[in-house]
Amino acid sequence: MEVIPFTHLKDWLSAAEADALLAMLEARSDWTQGRIRMFGREIPEPRLTFFEGDPGLRYTYAHRSLEGQGWTPELEALRDRFARDFGIKTNTVLANLYRDGQDSMGWHRDDEPELGPDPLVVSLSLGATRDFDVRRDADRWTERFALGHGDLLLMGRESQTQWMHCLPKRLRVGDLRINLTFRQVLS
């Protein structure tokens, strides 16, 4: 049996909780399409994002810097629930809105210096079910998770140091997906 540092909790949120959170997030007006640097050139991100976190905390990825301005009550409640239920403390959330199956995220790891040497990531999925692939560095062994509405993925120790992950394009997916990725940024 393979032991991997990812735990998939299906239906972690009830359907009613997931529906209410999805509606609240869809209605936000601060979704932006950032620009990232890849392979020496600047391109639009193939998704929309927003960032929340403790005031003054900075998170930088792909030459894009984000600063925490505080929390909405709904996302703060989730942050507190992760600490209570799993003992995982987080102080930022990066939200990704994938408008349909054309929006994606390439292979990467969340290993920015401000996340520390072996970061944990708590990932909550809402909306359309999408494949989420993880690949181990040592032998390129790959696992696929079908992350659905209300599912939680805990990305544990070594998930960002020994593995990469991606959200591949899926042309048959016509509905949106929102993914909330909670992290602990070191101050």
Give the ranges of each region predicted by the language model.
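Non-heme Fe(II) oxygenase metal-center motifs and adjacent flexible, charged/small-residue loops
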Residues: M1-S187
